[in-house]
Regions:
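Short, Lys/Arg-rich N-terminal segment immediately upstream of the first membrane anchor
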Residues: 1-5
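Function-determining sites in protein domains
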Residues: 6-11, 20-176
Length: 176
C-alpha cells in the first residue's frame, strides 16, 4: 500500500509541476505576428550623436527595394548574439509586416528569431532589430536597458550600410 501511495504522490507532483510550467509559459510574452511571415525593411533609423556621444535623437531613411535586399544580404554575414545589457549606439532597422506595405522581402531564418525580442509594453505591429556597438543610455532620469539583437562588429556593418544609404553624409548635412 505504501508503494502505491508513493506512486500516486509522484504522479501528482509531476502533474503539478507540468501545470505550473504551462501557466508560466502562458504568461510569457508572445510575438503578435507569425515569425515565418514575410517582412520588409521599412526604414533604417540611425543615431544622431552629440559631441560627447550623448543621445540627441535619431534620423531615418527609406531604402529602395534594391537597397533593402542589399541590407538583408549584408546582415546574413554577421554573427548574431542576444544581449540585454546595452543599448544601440548607432542604428537599427524597423521590420514591418509586408501585408501593410507594397515592397516584400523574405526574412532570413536567423532573423526570424529576432522578432521574438519585443517590448510587451509596446505591442505595435513592428519589431526592431537593433544593430551596432551599444552603451547604456540615461534620458529624463531613466536608464534604458531593453533586450536587443546585437550584431558583432557593428561599426563595420554601419560602414557597409553607410556605403549603401549614405548615412554619415545625411547626418553631416543636417548638422550644417
Amino acid at each position: 500500500m505504501k508503494k502505491k501511495g508513493k506512486i500516486i504522490l509522484t504522479v501528482v507532483l509531476v502533474v503539478a509541476i507540468a501545470a505550473v510550467a504551462a501557466a508560466v509559459a502562458a504568461f510569457r510574452p508572445q510575438p503578435v505576428l507569425d515569425p515565418a511571415g514575410t517582412y520588409e525593411v521599412q526604414r533604417v533609423n540611425y543615431w544622431l550623436e552629440g559631441p560627447n556621444l550623448e543621445w540627441e535623437g535619431y534620423l531615418h531613411t527609406m531604402p529602395t527595394p534594391e537597397q533593402a535586399q542589399e541590407i538583408l544580404a549584408l546582415l546574413e554575414g554577421y554573427e548574431k548574439t542576444l544581449s540585454a545589457d546595452r543599448l544601440p549606439q548607432r542604428l537599427f532597422l524597423n521590420l514591418l509586416p509586408a501585408q501593410f506595405q507594397s515592397m516584400e522581402v523574405q526574412l532570413p531564418e536567423w532573423l526570424e528569431a529576432a522578432i521574438f525580442i519585443w517590448d510587451p509594453e509596446n505591442q505595435d505591429d513592428y519589431f526592431n532589430l537593433i544593430l551596432g556597438d551599444g552603451h547604456v543610455q540615461i534620458r529624463d532620469g531613466y536608464t534604458y536597458l531593453p533586450p536587443y539583437y546585437e550584431i558583432s562588429n557593428g561599426q563595420q556593418l554601419y560602414q557597409e550600410l553607410d556605403a549603401i544609404l549614405h548615412l554619415d553624409q545625411r547626418m553631416a548635412e543636417l548638422r550644417d
